[in-house]
């Protein structure tokens, strides 16, 4: 079963160029999966279970602009072992402007450990066997050894944290945007982006470092990044930019 939400972009969604920011784009997708998971999430919360985002990969063809109406669609692709796979598409009218593939872990809050995904998950969510991006997230091996060619210190805010006292998944993309902007990169050129959530940022973390390095390629520049603090890595990832040729 596919679930969609539609809304117009407002001033809180856009950046200085009137285009949707990376963080806002992923918040819109997050709203769609929240709608899909409302009933199941309530049952899970009552038993101390939660979905935890482990990996995400996205293709961005165009960043929608202020007042543009967008539709975010999501579906459950399948689950296996400790993991569930969820897909997303973002449309502006008939134009698909972005898509994402995600891997989620099933977590027992009371026991503080992962659990196998319940066998009736597919029945609850409905299964749609379509990959929105064509990206195999299981084959991706994130790089952790980054040269810190560019760095930015990030200060967390109370509004960054969700009811579980962790930084919200979409806020990591706000942190990435800060890293890119402060070091002279144009996030509007990004065409693919992947992130692995290595460890949750707890509410006691007042600040962290974001670092990246870039590499040139014939088909456009690429970059790898990480977010960390005092030897603890919170997230790692990569992006590719459109070619200027």
What are these regions (language model features)?
Residues 154-239:
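Acidic/His-leaning functional-site neighborhoods
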Residues 1-53, 99-103, 107-191:
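Hot-dog-fold acyl-thioester-processing enzymes
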Residues 48-63, 188-200:
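Small beta-barrel nucleic-acid-binding modules, principally OB-folds
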Residues 3-4, 55-141, 200-204, 214-245:
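HotDog/MaoC-like acyl-thioester-processing domains
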């Amino acid at each position: 079963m596919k679930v969609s939400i539609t809304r117009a972009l407002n001033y809180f969604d856009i950046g200085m160029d009137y285009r949707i920011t990376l963080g806002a784009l992923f918040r819109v997708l997050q709203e769609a999966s929240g709608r899909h998971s409302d009933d199941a999430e309530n049952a899970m919360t009552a038993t101390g279970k939660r979905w935890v985002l482990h990996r995400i990969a996205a293709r961005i063809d165009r960043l929608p602009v202020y007042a543009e109406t967008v539709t975010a669609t999501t579906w459950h692709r399948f689950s296996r072992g400790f993991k569930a796979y969820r897909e997303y598409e973002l449309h502006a009218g008939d134009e698909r402007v972005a898509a994402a593939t995600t891997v989620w872990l099933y977590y027992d809050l009371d026991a503080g450990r992962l659990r196998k995904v319940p066998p009736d998950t597919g029945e609850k969510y409905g299964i749609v066997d379509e990959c929105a991006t064509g990206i195999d997230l299981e084959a991706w091996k994130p790089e952790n050894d980054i040269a810190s060619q560019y760095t930015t210190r990030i200060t967390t805010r109370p509004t960054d944290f969700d009811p579980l006292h962790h930084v919200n998944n979409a806020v990591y993309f706000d942190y990435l945007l800060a890293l890119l902007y402060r070091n002279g990169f144009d996030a509007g050129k990004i065409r693919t982006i992947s992130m692995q959530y290595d460890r949750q940022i707890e509410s006691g973390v007042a600040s962290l470092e974001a670092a990246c390095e870039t590499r040139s390629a014939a088909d456009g520049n690429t970059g790898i990044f990480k977010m960390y603090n005092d030897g603890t890595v919170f997230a790692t990832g990569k992006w590719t930019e459109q070619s200027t040729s």
